[in-house]
Structure formats: C-alpha cells, structure tokens
C-alpha cells in the first residue's frame, strides 16, 4: 500500500491495482484467473498443489523467512503453552492442517487433544478472546500488532518454538 501511495510502481512503469478479495482462497482465485498473483500462506499453497485435482498455480517467492504465527490467549488467562489447552475453546478458520498442528503441539506438551473444543471463528479477531473462545492462531505481524494497538495484552506462543517442524 505504501509503495502504491508513494508512486513507486508508477515510477517503474507498472500499473498496479491492489485487490482484497473476500470470496475464496487466494490460491483458488489465482487459479481461476481472478488475480495475476496472490500472497498467501504456506499451508494454502501446499493444499492447492497436493489436492486430488491440483490447482494450476506456482509458488515463486517467500516474503518472510520463517513461520511468524502462533497461538494466543489473553495475558491474564493462565494459558501459556499447549499443555494448558485441555478444557479450553480454540477458535480458528477450519483449515485442514489446523487440527493437525494443534494436535502435534498439544501431544508434544503432554496434553490430550481430544479435550480441546474447536470452533470456527466469527472473524472478530482478538475481541473474541475471553468471550467465545480461550485461544486463537494469530499472525504476529498483523493480528498481534492489531491487538496491541487496541490495548489487548496477549500470551503469544510462537509455533516455531513449540515444534521445530513448524
């Protein structure tokens, strides 16, 4: 957005329009030629390329060097590791890899995954914490920043610190 606002694209002879589609996943929209390229997360691309009917897309670059996401809870909740997830409610996006990551992290921490209640998030972000759910999966550079800007203190459990495979 800043580059567009400052005219950097135009200075290089590029006519750029930034579109934020809400109807569909990034990989699907690019495959349907509703965008020239998209910026997405690794799991979206992996699923698109390994599906029974793979999407005609190609990953060409990474923007960040490592996973910058993790689980969050309210700072005063007492939930500071996956060992604390038992008996709690997790709100997520319902992606196919989501449960597998939760289960792996909980198992590694000695917790019973079957004791975690999983619901689909209503999209309200950090505002849902402590109300409709106890924990969520946030992207540090976006969701955690937004929560901090709104005075919401969080416990952040970075995925790559919870399991080296992540």
Feature roles, as predicted:
Residues 1-3, 19-58, 68-82, 99-103, ...:
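Pocket-flanking alpha-helical
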Residues 83-96:
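Short loop->beta-strand "edge-of-pocket" segments that line small-molecule binding or catalytic clefts
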Residues 74-78, 93-98, 140-141, 159-164:
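Short coil/turn segments
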Residues 124-127, 131-166:
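Pocket-lining segment of extracytoplasmic ligand-binding domains
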Residues 15-22, 39, 111-123, 156-157:
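Short beta-strand-to-loop elements that line the ligand-binding cleft
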